[in-house]
């Protein structure tokens, strides 16, 4: 698959055009999460322990899709809500879909001190990020 780099504004326009032509934002989120999980699978020969660090926006929603897909594929998944519960409707829906699976949802970073993970997914910020970068030194690697 050939990839091209686009700006945040171009990505927003691509998504808007997709939605206008019958590809809903929720389906785009599903597709993005499944594609990201497929990349993760290429790095591991068998399921392990996965940490998915999610933000409160649509990038976090992508993370919830990754977590759900991995859990259904026998990964031991933990989700860390780094900024609290999701705020966008599509992210909320994908967050709620996790509740039927054995996926612990944490808001306390102490999970990083008490558990070992084979892989971690950063689903904090995407193209909608604005403002000053936030320091997540409490999410440091161990």
Residue ranges and their predicted role:
Residues 49-51, 119:
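Structural motif
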Residues 109-116:
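Short amphipathic alpha-helix with an adjacent loop that forms part of the alpha/beta core around
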Residues 61-105:
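Active-site-proximal loop->helix
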Residues 125-136:
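Glycine/threonine-rich flexible loop motifs
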Residues 137-142:
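Conserved small/polar residues in nucleotide/adenosyl-binding loops
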Residues 54, 124-125:
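Glycine-rich, N-terminal phosphate-binding loop of Rossmann-like dinucleotide-binding domains
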């Amino acid at each position: 698959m050939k990839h091209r780099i686009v700006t945040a504004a171009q990505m927003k326009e691509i998504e808007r055009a997709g939605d206008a032509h019958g590809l809903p934002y929720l389906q785009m989120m599903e597709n993005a999460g499944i594609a990201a999980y497929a990349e993760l699978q290429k790095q591991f020969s068998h399921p392990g322990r996965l940490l998915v660090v999610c933000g409160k926006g649509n990038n976090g929603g992508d993370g919830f899709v990754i977590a759900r897909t991995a859990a259904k594929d026998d990964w031991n998944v933990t989700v860390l809500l780094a900024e609290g519960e999701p705020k966008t409707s599509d992210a909320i829906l994908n967050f709620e879909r996790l509740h039927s699976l054995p996926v612990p949802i944490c808001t306390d970073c102490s999970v990083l001190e008490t558990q070992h993970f084979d892989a971690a997914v950063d689903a904090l910020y995407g193209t909608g990020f604005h403002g000053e970068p936030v320091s997540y030194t409490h999410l440091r690697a161990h």
